[in-house]
A protein has these predicted regions:
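Matrix-facing interhelical linker segments
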Residues: 1-357
Length: 357
């Protein structure tokens, strides 16, 4: 229960003003975001593992896709093979990545939003979407290699495997892509193709950025829709007709660098509901690009090692499974993302409140 701000509470008085441009706000919002991300990912760790195995068409689990019983069967197989540790394989890399990722994302959103939206009149859907998209892109720039490592840890399923964080990093770094297959029709084309291959990195650090472009493209609709849906539903929950049931009293405070007032905190069920809806919307609009990204990220352990571009991966998925291939694992995605995003926004909002920002 959130404490009342009435009376002579000295700490409450100190927290009635919020300056989003202060160094303290930057640090605290980053910490709140990082903790929120870790909490959310821990809640859905097993779901995330199975979803990655489905999306990347892992040979051992591809047979379970497209069936309502596929998910529980996959969980059972992982449990029997490796126990709880198997369900959370790659989770250490997840937490290593998610703390800075979520911290940067929420911090960036607050700062970008404060500069894009200066007053209530500018509180439009377009500005909210742009703020969320830019925040998501910023976070991806700084944390993408950790995401590749996490996916590779989660992808491995062979019995007896003891791959850890350091061994996976070495594997990814040392992988050499197979030469690109091409059939040039003339000498000029052949020379150009050969030159491009020689100039294109075939191993090393570039391996940690497989799938970076679709990730960046996918972050535009995902983060944009997520923050837009959350903020919009938060407004709905605070409508006068709903406020008596959804809002905690005496929890609003002013912002020093704007003319607006920071809205009061929502009750736990209302905050979880807004986050869940945000997760559903964002997952739906961005899922095809997420599938393409996963397939690119595991390129070094499936197929012939040939490094594929977005268009080629998209084409292969369509040839293999048709348009449904772009939505493999979406049901698990919903089951995973709704509680994950709900937990993330809930912990973040509560974290900000208790940190006094």
């Amino acid at each position: 229960m959130v404490p009342s701000r009435r009376g002579g509470d000295k700490h409450a008085a100190e927290r009635t003003k919020v300056d989003k441009k202060s160094y303290e706000y930057l640090v605290k919002s980053g910490i709140a975001g990082g903790i929120a991300g870790c909490a959310a990912k821990t809640v859905v760790g097993p779901l995330d593992r199975v979803k990655i195995l489905f999306q990347t068409q892992n040979p051992q689990f591809a047979k379970y896709t497209g069936s309502w019983t596929g998910f529980p069967t996959a969980v059972r197989d992982i449990w029997l093979q490796a126990g709880v540790q198997g369900l959370f394989k790659g989770h250490s890399a997840t937490l290593l990545r998610i703390f800075p990722y979520a911290g940067i994302k929420f911090l960036a959103y607050e700062q970008i939003r404060a500069r894009v939206i200066h007053s209530k009149a500018q509180e439009t859907a377009g500005r909210r979407f742009v703020s969320g998209s830019l925040a998501g892109m910023v976070s991806v720039f700084f944390t993408y290699p950790l995401e590749v490592i996490r996916v590779r840890l989660a992808f491995e399923t062979r019995a007896g495997e003891t791959s850890n964080l350091s061994s996976i990093i070495r594997k990814i770094y040392s992988e050499t892509a197979a030469p690109t297959s091409h059939n040039p029709t003339n000498a000029i084309t052949a020379t150009a193709s050969s030159a491009v291959e020689k100039l294109t990195p075939q191993a090393g650090l570039s391996n940690f950025f497989r799938g970076f472009t679709p990730t960046l493209l996918g972050m535009v609709p995902y983060a944009g829709a997520s923050f837009l849906a959350h903020d919009t539903m938060s407004d709905v929950m605070r409508w006068p007709v709903l406020a008596p049931y959804t809002v905690l009293p005496n929890t609003s405070r002013d912002e020093t660098n704007t003319t607006s007032q920071k809205p009061p905190q929502l009750r736990y069920w209302a905050e979880l509901s807004t986050g869940g809806i945000a997760g559903f919307v964002s997952q739906t609009v961005s899922y095809p690009l997420e599938v393409i990204r996963r397939r690119m990220q595991v390129g070094g352990v499936v197929g012939d090692g040939h490094r594929l571009g977005i268009a080629e991966v998209a084409k292969r998925i369509y040839v293999e499974r048709g348009w449904r291939g772009y939505f493999v694992g979406l049901t698990i995605g919903y089951v995973k993302v709704v509680p994950m995003v709900a937990t993330s926004f809930f912990v973040y909002e509560r974290g900000k409140y208790y940190l006094g920002i």
